Amino acid sequence: LVGSEMCIRDRCMAVCVQAQKKNFSYKFYGQVRGDLFYNSRANAEIGDGSFHLYPKDVALDADGKDLNASPNGSFYLLYSRLGIDVQGPKVGSAKTSLKLEADFRGSGSNWAVLRIRHAYVNLDWGKSAVLIGQTWHPLFGEVFPQMLNLSTGAPFQPFNRSPQIRYRYTDNGWQLTGSVLWQLQYLSAGPNGKSEEYIKNSCVPEVYLGVDYKKPGWQVGAGMEILSLVPRTQNEVDGKIYKVSERVSSVSGEAHVKYQDANWLVMAKTLLASNLTQTCMLGGYGVTSIDPRTGEQEYSPYLFSTSWLNIVYGKKWKPGLFLGYLKNLGANEALVGKTYGVGLDVDQVFTTNLQLSYNLPHWKLGVEYSPSIAWYGNVDLQDGGRIHDTHSITNHRVLGVLIYTF
């Protein structure tokens, strides 16, 4: 009798589990990706050579030889990935879904370690939707370059996935987006290098507001981002430690456009980027005043102007062109102390990407050639850190990519 009761109970549990599963649908996906690349000289990079930003300046040794004028290259499969999309039962009138996606990039120098790319739930009421979790930063958005390089247009295009709470309203072609964001893998620069502590100590999340209008074949939009960081909470002067109250706030804006038909894809975006180092862009801030007793500092953020254009044609054979340009506009005030950021010694960067890919169902094989020019010079702190008397440095990058998706 006991055995019969256990059997009946197990069958009931199996029926209940099966009934619950009927309310869910699952879609597994992924890709194996190999990146083979060559650079003619050393470059500023994110983590490894797969994520290229711009060429480094001349660094002379004792014999007057350029230490950075050495080629490099490698072959990586770190950005292969696995993911799952789940459609769940309704919560009230809201459709529910979630996404989990990971690759093997790891973090820092810990390569070939599983890393979360996306992890979020989404509640969709039709016109309104709320997303909670980690996904693409809204500055990355729906308009981003179609290219082979993993940088996807950085440092001209924001590149970032962050924990966030996002509200989106869609009606009659209009799409309104509001997000509050925190930092996890993509971090702001500051006195202790790149760290989460600056936004954590701020207690104020990053804020984004944007609007898009869509019609068949077209999308246009604009957005604004606000970031407020606390660089330090204490400082030491002559062996004495003082509590300090510091904050640096910045506002960035962007506008974008996209056209697509059966064969053509044309996109462009322009930004006024202020202290967007957490998005793999150039930027940061500098010290404008220092309290002589406590060492407490005030700051001014740098402003960078960036723009890019991307054109891709075809279906099976896809030639493409990407053009990116950025300019260091400096800070609004004279600087009297240290600067913190990425690429603050760079005046301009111009990059061209020429790509050709062969596409089949589940397969992509492509090659890309990318000459990149950076201008360096003398940093004038009294002029807000702007660069004068510049000279140019060029890197030639060749990339081969093989991708199998499922």
Indicate residue ranges for each PLM-predicted region.
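Transmembrane beta-barrel outer-membrane domains
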Residues: 21, 73-79, 111-118, 156-160, ...
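Outer-membrane beta-barrel proteins
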Residues: 39-43, 109-111, 141-145, 185-190, ...
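Outer membrane beta-barrel
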Residues: 21-48, 58-186, 203-204, 208, ...
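Detector for outer-membrane/organellar transmembrane beta-barrel domains
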Residues: 217-346
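Short, small-residue-biased leader/transition segments that mark boundaries at the very start
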Residues: 1-8
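Outer-membrane beta-barrel "beta-signal"
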Residues: 360, 390-406
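Extracellular loop and loop/strand-boundary signature of outer-membrane beta-barrel proteins
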Residues: 67-70, 105, 148-153, 188-197, ...
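Boundary at the C-terminal end of the N-terminal hydrophobic targeting segment
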Residues: 14-21
